[in-house]
Curated annotation (Swiss-Prot):
This is Probable chemoreceptor glutamine deamidase CheD. Signal peptide: none annotated. One of its GO terms (molecular function) is protein-glutamine glutaminase activity. Its EC number is 3.5.1.44. It comes from Desulfitobacterium hafniense (strain Y51). Probably deamidates glutamine residues to glutamate on methyl-accepting chemotaxis receptors (MCPs), playing an important role in chemotaxis. It is an enzyme of class 3 (hydrolase).
Amino acid sequence: MSNVISVGMADLKTTKAPNILMTAGLGSCIGICVHDPIQKVGGMAHIMLPTAGSAPGGNPAKYADTAMDLLVTEILRLGASKSRLRAKMAGGAQMFSFPGKPPVLKIGDRNAEQVIVELKRLGIPLLVSDVGGSFGRTIHFDVGTGDLKVRTINHGEKVI
């Protein structure tokens, strides 16, 4: 019997199969899911911003550049092999329109780009993503199968 484990904003959790990780309220935030398909362990981070920048020492789960290292460390503690880790992500929407404003305000795009940078640095392949648009998402990640269910209002539900 699987348990659904909720991951809050600026939070990360790891678990073993048959558990499912869930986060809601992904607008410009990114839900990044990493798992080892052989050991059937994985984790999810709900990342709010691309880099810690001038806020070092804060909550590492809040930022892509610090959350990814922590997420991988915690997954490895559950018995995963770094060489088998795979990732999927969702979110990164542009929830509000800022015509004529600088790219710095496109937080969703910047979050997705930074997660990709961190995955490349860590040598973890990104298998699939569902990012962008102007709508929020709720995701459920099955760490046993690696299935990521993405649910949206007015845009349906899909498994990636």
